[in-house]
Amino acid sequence: MQISNSYLQLGDDFYLPSTPRQPSNPQLFLWNQGLAESLGVADFLAQEQEDPAGFFSGGRLLPNSKPVALAYAGHQFGHFNPRLGDGRAHLLGELRGDTDMVFDVQLKGSGATPFSRGGDGLCGLGPAVREFIMSEAMAALGVPTSRTLAVVTTGDEVYRGDAVPGAVVCRVAASHLRVGTFEYFYAQGNKDAIERLCDYAISRHFPELASSEGPEKYSGFLRAVFSRQVELVCEWLRVGFVHGVMNTDNTTISGETIDYGPCAMISTYNPNTVFSSIDAMGRYRFGHQPSIAHWNMARLTECFLPLLDQDSKQATAIGESLLGEFPQNFEQRYHHMLASKTGVRLQGDSDKALCEDFLQLLRKQGLDYTNSFDSLTRSLIDPQHEDRCASQWPEWYQAWSARIEQQGRPREVVAEGMRRHNPVVIPRNHHMEAVIDECIKNGSPDAAKSWLKVLRRPYQDLPTTPNYQDPPADGDRSYQTFCGT
């Protein structure tokens, strides 16, 4: 295992050196063995006979690690801040995985940095456990996401109103390049830095563009980033995920989900669902996430206008043309996603309407999003669920059944295809809170580990799956989330 530091080659405008805080008594709380093996970390620890807690709490540095805090800006709830940066995170470097992909390794909650703006740079155990569970659940669901290698308790208390146990999260991501990273240099008028950053992003995420040059390269880069955002948000909508804080500093160039602070999962289907306590206007509500992704891509495109054409009017026209492709591409991908969830082969507007009508029924009847699609899937092979669905949605179910029959595929085959898009279990909010509370109360990760066994197989019926399928009694109407990590 060898840590590399390619980001440092971009120059010291891109980061500030920062040493992680020394924890008083680091103890491993949660460990991702599969991820550790894929990164070569498990072999390294075995050979060196080392405890992971020291390395992944900031207490010790991995060989060749040169920790830094990354510089970036960002639009937060629509308002621009020209200097944000990692205020409580340290990039340790990069590791090459078993698929030959390179991944960033970062500590969160590892102490103050030059970007902390007066904060303590620390993290409580609750938000750390949430990040581990959510990122692993999302990965198992098939959603592009950062991962969590470890949660380490520090032995120190963190004050968030009350004293809570401190923890450090070790996050692994395809990179930590953000829309806000480009905005940071655009705000300074640093065209050269944007060019270097784009070349670096291409080398990490879009090597197929490496031979492109000039405006063609930058147009291709923007299209590639747009495509990944379309895919990402469609996946969020597929599983019922509400990010909660889709600021441009949380929008990755890689197209991975990052920052699980105020996130949540919808229960009762309603596009206007919002959980974040700081999102009073509902800017980042469930059904508005595609529009926000488009808005964020507009902010990225602005950074590239000087590179798209020397003439500002022509550059703006090119940028607007590129952005104009986003809604259509999203709409196409979204309808295919929805068709996959309902088992319908899209052949016209009537099929799109059939899929949309199902969502409208769920909203009108105040039904659970995940369990309704699960029941619809089972109705093809289980008479009990068939009777239930036919009773719940008589007209729609009759039309849907006729369409499935008309397609000529065996019901078992359709059900199998639907199952790949409709999970049996998701990381429901009330279970998340209960598990976090139990972990903190008992000082033990057992509750999290038990739940993770189910969440890592979300499309299968396990003996313990029913324990986590029930929706909350009030449909999460009173549930709120808060920024934590």
Swiss-Prot record:
Keyword Membrane: no
Catalytic site: 249 (proton acceptor)
Reactions listed under catalytic activity: L-seryl-[protein] + ATP = 3-O-(5'-adenylyl)-L-seryl-[protein] + diphosphate; L-threonyl-[protein] + ATP = 3-O-(5'-adenylyl)-L-threonyl-[protein] + diphosphate; L-tyrosyl-[protein] + ATP = O-(5'-adenylyl)-L-tyrosyl-[protein] + diphosphate; L-histidyl-[protein] + UTP = N(tele)-(5'-uridylyl)-L-histidyl-[protein] + diphosphate
Reported cofactor(s): Mg(2+); Mn(2+)
Annotated residues for binding of ATP: 85, 87-88, 108, 120-121, 171, 178, 259
Chain sites annotated for binding Mg(2+): 250, 259
Positions of region (Disordered): 462-485
InterPro entries: SelO
Keyword annotations: ATP-binding, Magnesium, Manganese, Metal-binding, Nucleotide-binding, Nucleotidyltransferase, Transferase
Presence of the UniProt keyword Transferase in the record: yes
GO molecular function: AMPylase activity; ATP binding; magnesium ion binding
Record EC number: 2.7.7.-, 2.7.7.108
Broad enzyme group: transferase
Family: Belongs to the SELO family.
Biological function: Nucleotidyltransferase involved in the post-translational modification of proteins. It can catalyze the addition of adenosine monophosphate (AMP) or uridine monophosphate (UMP) to a protein, resulting in modifications known as AMPylation and UMPylation.
Protein name: Protein nucleotidyltransferase YdiU
